[in-house]
């Protein structure tokens, strides 16, 4: 038997799963959410237990949580921690929605082992990850989506193109930061993609219709299962096809009509209620020909949460953490508001350190940071963001 120096307390406690190692697509934005969640739990008198394995993050500082487990974010390590901390049956549950995609993938093993997930259920998380079932749900709700298909080889992809047509967006399933995602315009490019080292045997490949010239929109919201607060509707400055982590965006949106904004709010609330979301939800939309398409739904905090929090002056991660412990949204009297000042987020790229890298932006994420510009004039807000990003 291994030695265990853990001194388990009798206090009510919650385990927060962090984002793990920094990499393109999963960085410090998620750590921001974890840190503010820990502070929020402490204020409620709940013991906060952080599980993370990145010494460069703030969440692993000694004074952020009541207890820190510096362990890898895999099912074996996390389940062992849950077992150790729940000896007195005082563990309220585990928060998986603040650390990006990594902790979200552990939710199935946690549920199978009888560990409670705080917030959105695994059933809803799994539904969002399952492309076929999610597409069926969108069809049932009469919500538009780009045409899509799931294939396993080049032969199946050729058949799928008959109904989807070029150009398409293609990517392996279960990837982060748009890794190995490409925009394909013809059969030659499609064949080259399947002959590349992106393809892993027996793993599914996702094909989506590429909406040429569409505007991309990011929406962050919080729900308690009944009430929904839409904290921000962000309009991307680059057109759809550039990864959301690489695209500059504006809050409030610049070119969307009141009709489109109302439709985005309606769909966001409909999806949140249907999935019984508790905590964060992020939805990515595409707008083309005055039609609203749902690209993706993430039942977790997104990388834009810190930006929206600072732009609106609302501590979203703190509020969401309290929702996860049973507090109702009505307590905060939150309402969607349009700021008099403009906030513009701009991505920071490492091209000066990697001069041979491809400078053209696409669906695979390349940025390693972000900045924001604030001003009452939209043009000045953009200018400030460009100066901050050293562009």
Regions inferred by a protein language model and the residue ranges of each:
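A short helix-to-beta-strand connector/capping loop
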Residues: 65, 113, 143-146
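Short Gly/Thr/Asp-enriched flexible loops that form oxyanion-binding sites at enzyme active sites
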Residues: 101-114
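Short glycine-/small-residue-rich flexible loop motifs, especially phosphate/cofactor-binding loops
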Residues: 38, 107, 135, 158, ...
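N-terminal Rossmann-like NAD(P) cofactor-binding module of classical short-chain dehydrogenase/reductase
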Residues: 95
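ATP-dependent carboxylate activation and anion-phosphoryl transfer catalytic cores
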Residues: 1-12, 17-24, 31-92, 101-104, ...
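A conserved helix-loop-beta module that forms one wall/lid of the active-site cleft
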Residues: 120-181
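Hydrophobic/aromatic ligand-binding patch that stacks against planar heteroaromatic rings
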Residues: 40, 109, 137, 160, ...
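Glycine-rich phosphate-binding loop
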Residues: 98
């Amino acid at each position: 038997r291994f030695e265990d120096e853990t001194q388990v307390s009798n206090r009510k406690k919650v385990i927060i799963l962090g984002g793990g190692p920094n990499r393109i697509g999963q960085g410090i934005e998620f750590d921001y959410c974890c840190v503010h969640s820990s502070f929020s739990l402490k204020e409620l008198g709940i013991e906060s237990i952080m599980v993370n394995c990145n010494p460069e993050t703030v969440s692993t500082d000694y004074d952020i949580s009541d207890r820190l487990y510096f362990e890898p974010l895999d099912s074996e390590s996390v389940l062992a921690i849950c077992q150790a901390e729940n000896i007195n049956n005082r563990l309220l549950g585990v928060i998986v929605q603040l650390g990006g995609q990594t902790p979200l993938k552990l939710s199935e093993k946690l549920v199978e082992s009888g560990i409670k997930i705080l917030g959105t259920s695994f059933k809803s998380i799994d539904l969002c990850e399952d492309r076929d079932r999610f597409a069926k749900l969108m069809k049932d709700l009469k919500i538009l989506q780009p045409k899509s298909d799931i294939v396993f080889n080049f032969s199946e992809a050729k058949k799928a193109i008959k109904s989807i047509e070029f150009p398409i967006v293609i990517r392996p399933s279960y990837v982060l930061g748009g890794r190995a995602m490409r925009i394909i315009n013809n059969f030659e490019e499609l064949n080259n993609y399947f002959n590349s080292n992106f393809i892993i045997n027996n793993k599914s490949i996702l094909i989506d219709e590429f909406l040429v010239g569409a505007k991309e929109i990011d929406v962050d919201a919080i729900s308690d299962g009944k009430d929904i607060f839409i904290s921000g509707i962000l309009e991307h400055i680059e057109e759809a096809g550039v990864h959301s982590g690489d695209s500059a965006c504006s809050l409030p949106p610049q070119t969307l009509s009141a009709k489109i904004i109302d439709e985005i709010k309606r769909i966001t609330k409909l999806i949140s209620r249907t999935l019984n979301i508790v905590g964060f939800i992020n939805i990515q939309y595409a707008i083309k020909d005055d039609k609203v398409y749902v690209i993706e739904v993430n039942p977790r905090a997104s990388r834009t949460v810190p930006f929206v929090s600072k732009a609106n002056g609302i501590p979203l991660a703190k509020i969401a953490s309290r929702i996860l412990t049973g507090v109702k949204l009505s307590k905060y009297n939150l309402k969607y508001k349009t700021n008099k000042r403009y906030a513009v987020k701009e991505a920071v790229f490492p091209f000066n350190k990697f001069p041979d890298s491809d400078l053209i932006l696409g669906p695979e994420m390349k940025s390693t940071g972000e900045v924001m510009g604030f001003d009452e004039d939209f043009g000045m807000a953009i200018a400030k963001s460009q100066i901050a990003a050293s562009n």
